Amino acid sequence: MSTNFVPVPPQAAPQGGPAYPAPQGAPAYPAPQGAPAYAAPQNGQAMPIVQLQSVSKLYGQGDAQVRALVDVTVGFGAGEFTAIMGPSGSGKSTMMHILAGLDAPTSGRVYVEGTDITALNDTALTKLRRDRIGFVFQSFNLVPTLDARANILLPMRLAGATPDPAWFDMIVASLGIGDRLGHRPSEMSGGQQQRVAVARALMSRPAVIVADEPTGNLDSRSTGEVMELLRRAVDELGQSVIMVTHDTRTAAYADRVLVCRDGQVVSDLRDVTADSLAASLR
């Protein structure tokens, strides 16, 4: 199977939401040599890169026990953008933490690229998270004393891995941050900082990027820019993205939206707009 991906133009802002501009001067690129090959979707469904099987998560005991997740079985497609939504206490954040290996289920199994991460010891799980899962957080989590270049490369340096210069240049050009590489976080806008965080997540070519409210601290313009970048990472680089959000406008950028309520997935939606999604959440 070819490892090159056919670039797809960035999709327009979702219907019912503001017209978010794409970053200026961000060209489309094929995936570099050595990038993972992704299976083509079957019957409109992408092959799963992450799977939860009969996953439950309980906190506390007795009358104080909380059932955060209840027997959840769901797969996340390779090369697909999935958004997870739901009210506070619905289980969406717990699901994200468990599928990313940040928390363990009370029962059930979690698979990343076919590996049962619930069976891994702490050392192996830490390595898998470092090598195969990219994280993008609401608070950016950049090191304030390092410039953008050093922040992007930091996880690979800590892992003792050698960065691929061509891949680095490709990501930087695609995200439009080439003129900010020498700047520290305090010298960048929120949108620029989040672009650096996305570049850091992409640098190791992870199996999946997990984004936790990635636009929660951004204004509307920066929100649109970051969502276009995540969308392009899927369309142009074959990246898999799983995002937790409360915002229907950002969720509408996804290929698929899971709606959680009372610890269960109650809706599995495709081809949504911001307006139709808002209506389904009422």
What are these regions (language model features)?
Residues 1-11:
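N-terminal acidic, proline/glycine-rich, low-complexity intrinsically disordered segments
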Residues 3, 23, 32, 42, ...:
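Generic cytosolic/nucleocytoplasmic N-terminal low-complexity/intrinsically disordered segments
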Residues 19-38:
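Long, intrinsically disordered low-complexity tandem-repeat segments
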Residues 37-49:
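Primarily ABC-family ATPase nucleotide-binding module
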Residues 47-265:
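ABC family nucleotide-binding domain
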Residues 264-282:
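Conserved beta-strand-loop-alpha-helix hinge in the C-terminal portion
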